[in-house]
Amino acid sequence: MDFLKTVASEYSKSQQGSGSNDAQHQQSGLSGMLLNNNLFDVLDSDADKKKTAEAAAQASGSHGNSDMFHNVLNKLNQNKHSVAQEKDNVDEDFAVKMFKKFVEKKDTSSDEKASSNNLGAAAAMQAIKMFNSGSGSGSSSSGSGGQAALLGLAMSEGSKLFDNAQAEGKVAKGTTKESVIEQAVQFALKFFLKSQTSGSSGGNSGLMGLAAKFL
């Protein structure tokens, strides 16, 4: 929730004549803004990437910094079309399993290591859960706040999961914090794009349906 408020506030400040669009109003409308904008537009915008990186750094506290997050977003922008082509192959059940193992700590039977792919999937699912629980049926006005929230949440949660796994001595060999964050935003992008093409009600219902598996 703190992250959603931060993004909403930063987005509100960036708009002219935004006096009536306070942080609470923007927060409630994040889902609507997400649906009314091309997610690629955020990645194409240096200003949006910078705001997203800064908000993610604030949300992650000592776990991450804006330079690292900005680098990850730049890489995602360069690879966004190839990542998008993989959207239909993304495994929701696998991501939910990783979420339960590394976030909820419920799945103790599996022996999956804390690799970039596993932690990234878990972080993306946590981001979707937080995004849906923090959004409502408010404003449907256009803007980049929604996209920034989804990508930023994935990055901040990825950085936290890596540090937690490292503290427990469970990080797989060769796994770095940046590689986890890269996987987290890639999973988030794939899930969003897949949700846009599944069902007749659009991306929001798709993300809500995905979150319903563990909410």
List each language-model region with its residue ranges.
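Amphipathic alpha-helical interaction segments
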Residues: 1-215
